[in-house]
């Protein structure tokens, strides 16, 4: 049974994936391109969500390559694809991968949610060919400074609701600080040539980025009430996210690339 808090059955999922893809795909594509990604590569996109990065990988590797997009619940990836890009309903924690020897394995904002993340990391490393690249991209959920607010109480309200959201995530086994631990975890897993780049931007009320916060808070509204957030606070939080006088730092995405040593068999 999944413990993933924002499961993909929620009607808010489409908006969540839209915000994630619009805000972070250009950055993620740059990180993936830096691995040497080329026609003919075999790639694994784990927890592919809306599938946009898996589709982009498919364009880069061309018909001579192969991309497998997995997800616990891939309902948001259902659309026509070329035959070399396939979608698999798959639990990365409990089900064996159909194959290994990948040139590139990528997962964005997946291991953060999985309590067994270190065991999953070992499986992802084992799925690489010697010399293959792993790219993990994760949030540090704790660094979200408010950059501008319409009044004195708004920053405190934002921080209160976000803290409740993070508390709900942690109760489901998420590690909200995972982003800052990924580099060391990948080194411990035996990867070399490690490099990290972090991306953040400002998100203004009413914009695409804060759509992520709208979607998340709406999907877990009941859990937020359990954390003591009142109906009135929740209503004011959503109004704040719609206010162009409010600007907050985006969640910082820490992208780490490493390679399986070439000498390994
Ligand atoms: C926050 S979303 C990120 C989606 C996408 N990677 C992105 O960054 O746009 C997390 C995704 O991981 C998937 N997921 C969660 N647990 C998983 C598991 N055990 N195995 C495979 N996918 C999982 C969820 O279904 C969801 O689609």
Predicted regions, residues:
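Class I SAM-dependent methyltransferase SAM/SAH-binding core
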Residues: 44-95
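Conserved catalytic/acceptor-binding region of the Class I
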Residues: 135-207
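A short SAM/SAH-binding and catalytic strip from SAM-dependent methyltransferases
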Residues: 103-118
């Amino acid at each position: 049974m999944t413990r993933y808090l924002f499961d993909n059955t929620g009607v808010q999922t489409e908006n969540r994936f839209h915000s994630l893809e619009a805000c972070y795909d250009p950055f993620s594509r740059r990180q993936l391109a830096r691995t040497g990604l080329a026609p003919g590569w075999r790639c694994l996109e784990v927890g592919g969500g809306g599938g946009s990065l898996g589709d982009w990988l498919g364009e880069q590797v061309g018909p001579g390559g192969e991309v497998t997009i997995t997800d616990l619940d891939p309902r948001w990836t259902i659309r026509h694809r070329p035959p070399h890009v396939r979608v698999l309903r798959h639990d990365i924690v409990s089900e064996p991968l159909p194959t290994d020897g990948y040139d590139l394995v990528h997962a964005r904002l997946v291991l953060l949610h999985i309590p067994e993340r270190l065991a999953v990391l070992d499986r992802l490393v084992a799925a690489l060919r010697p010399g293959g690249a792993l790219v993990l991209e994760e949030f540090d959920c704790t660094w979200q400074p408010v950059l501008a607010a319409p009044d004195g109480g708004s920053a405190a309200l934002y921080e209160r609701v976000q803290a409740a959201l993070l508390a709900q995530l942690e109760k489901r086994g998420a590690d909200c600080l995972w982003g800052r631990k990924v580099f060391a975890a990948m080194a411990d897993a035996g990867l070399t040539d490690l490099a990290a780049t972090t991306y953040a931007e400002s998100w203004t009320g009413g914009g695409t980025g804060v759509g992520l916060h709208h979607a998340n808070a709406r999907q877990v509204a009941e859990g937020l009430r359990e954390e003591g957030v009142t109906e009135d606070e929740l209503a004011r939080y959503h109004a704040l996210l719609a206010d162009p006088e409010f600007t907050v730092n985006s969640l910082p995405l820490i992208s780490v690339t490493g390679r399986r040593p070439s000498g390994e068999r």
